[in-house]
Amino acid sequence: MKKLILSLFFLSAFTLRGSAQLQGLEVVKVPEAQQPYSGEYIYIPDVEGYKTLKCDFHTHTIFSDGDIKPENRVWEAAIRGLDVIAITDHIEYRPNKDYIKADHNESYKRAKTVEKASNLIVIQGAEITRSKPIGHINALFLTDANALDVEDPLRAVDNALEQGAFIMWNHPGWPNDTSTLYNVHKDLIKQKKIHGIEVVNGFEYYPKAFNYCKEYGLTYMGNTDIHGVYKQTYRTDKQSGSMTIVFAKERSQEGVKEALLAGRSVVKFGDILIGSEKNLLSLVKACLSYEVKEVKGNQALVKVTNKSTLNFEILLDNKAGTILGNATVEIKVRLDDKVKFTTTHITDDSRLVIDIASLR
């Protein structure tokens, strides 16, 4: 119905212009024909006093092997409804370098020019791009990406750390569909030189990497690794791009960095949520509110309101159900029962489970 009304509005506007006397006019402007895309709407409430920020920490531009300018990459992120974007062009792989001549800081500098207008936090990063076993490594919160352009990848990591960088091991299952934790990664983790793992990259995720995050206390990360145009890459009517949800003390670059180093993140991939038990529990409790309508013995009727746009798949009393975003449902429960959130992942074989009694 809205589309029909809008179409009739446009038709009437253009008809009026067409029927009006045009003789002698230089230009006829039709501003009502311009309807800017309003973007994706993903609402997740703040969690336990922290600011909930939607982030993409892995993106590319024409300054490495991406298809669009850094400024446009930032505007795409704004349209996606993100709060934070990191520009992480490849250090070693720059197929456009013959006709786009610039150093490794230029893409961030250009992205930074639209930070204020876009209302995003723009972070400088870079991707150390080597073959396995070390693979690809993102360094975030850099001050000089040129310092990473060295022969030894371990020296590049150290140079990033000297700038106070957050180090993320990218897409561990790419390109050979095997998420092996090599000795080089174990050594870097032991030395506290890897802080997080990208458990989701673009259209795939790596269940073994969930286990690595839990075992070693690393931050769960998920990003698009976008190279092309976002609207040509993602069917946003089906699923939005993957993102890292960060719980920050403040909405600032410093706040984001502190949160990542502290491990306060959950990864969103469609309706799948991946993170530590603590962070998943905090997120679910922030999104869902409960009201006990009536109690009869060990049975209760509970009204559940989902304040977020996230959809939660649950298993309760061996029955599957869905709590849709921005919806309210009434559920009959036993007070000694447990509810499993089946689209959450802590490890490859563990989900978030909550005692019903703890929700009262």
Language-model segments: residues:
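Conserved catalytic scaffold of divalent metal-dependent phosphoesterases
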Residues: 172-174
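Alpha-helical transmembrane segments and their juxtamembrane interfaces
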Residues: 12-13, 68, 99, 235
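Sec/Tat signal peptide C-region and signal peptidase I cleavage site
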Residues: 16-20
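Charged catalytic cores and adjacent phosphate/nucleic-acid-binding surfaces used
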Residues: 2, 21-55, 74, 134-142, ...
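Sec-dependent N-terminal signal peptides
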Residues: 4-13
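Generic beta-sheet signal
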Residues: 165-167, 220
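A metal-dependent hydrolase metal-coordination microenvironment
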Residues: 33-163, 170, 179, 192, ...
